C-alpha cells in the first residue's frame, strides 16, 4: 500500500515518488493531519443549542476536508491522469496518524511518503 502524509505545516512536496512506487496499485491513501479537532467544542458546549452545536461541528469537519482536498489536489490530479484513485483520510493529531498507519501495517506492507517534519515518533 502506498500512503502519503501531509498537514498544514508539512505539505506533501513530491507527488512523483509515490506515483512511481505504485507498481500497478490502483489506489493511493492520503492522510491529512488537520491538527486539533475543534469540532470537539461543538460537541461539549453545554450553553449552545443542539442545532448550533451540530452546525459548528459540521463546519469544522467541512473546513478540515477542504484543507485536505487542497493539500492533496496535485497528487489527486496526477493519480487520475494515470488511471489511479486516491482515498483521502482526514485525522486529528499525530496520535491519530500513528494509529491509522499502525492499523494499515497490520494488514500488510505500507510505503509512506511525505510527512517530513510531522511529529509521528
Can you say where each PLM-predicted feature lies in the sequence?
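A general secondary-structure junction signal
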Residues: 30-32, 90-92, 116
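A short acidic, glycine-rich active-site loop
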Residues: 51-70
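Structural beta-alpha unit
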Residues: 77-111
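Aromatic/hydrophobic pocket-lining residues that form π-stacking "cages" and hydrophobic walls in ligand
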Residues: 16-18, 75, 100
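Short beta->alpha connector loops
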Residues: 7-12, 92-96, 118-119
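Well-ordered, non-membrane alpha-helical segments in soluble/globular domains
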Residues: 12-15, 68-73
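Glycine-rich, Arg-bearing micro-motifs that act as flexible, cationic patches
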Residues: 111-121
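Small/aliphatic-rich secondary-structure junction motif
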Residues: 1-56
Amino acid at each position: 500500500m502506498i500512503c502519503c502524509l501531509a498537514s498544514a505545516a508539512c505539505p506533501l512536496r513530491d507527488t512523483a515518488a509515490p506515483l512511481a512506487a505504485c507498481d500497478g496499485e490502483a489506489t493511493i491513501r492520503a492522510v491529512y493531519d488537520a491538527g486539533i479537532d475543534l469540532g470537539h467544542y461543538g460537541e461539549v458546549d453545554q450553553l449552545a443549542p443542539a442545532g448550533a452545536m451540530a452546525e459548528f461541528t459540521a463546519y469544522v469537519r467541512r473546513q478540515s476536508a477542504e484543507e485536505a482536498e487542497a493539500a492533496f489536489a496535485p497528487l489527486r490530479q496526477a493519480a487520475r491522469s494515470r488511471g489511479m484513485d486516491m482515498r483521502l483520510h482526514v485525522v486529528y493529531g499525530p496520535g491519530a496518524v500513528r494509529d491509522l498507519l499502525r492499523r494499515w501495517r497490520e494488514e500488510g506492507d505500507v510505503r509512506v511518503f511525505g510527512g517530513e517534519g510531522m511529529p509521528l515518533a
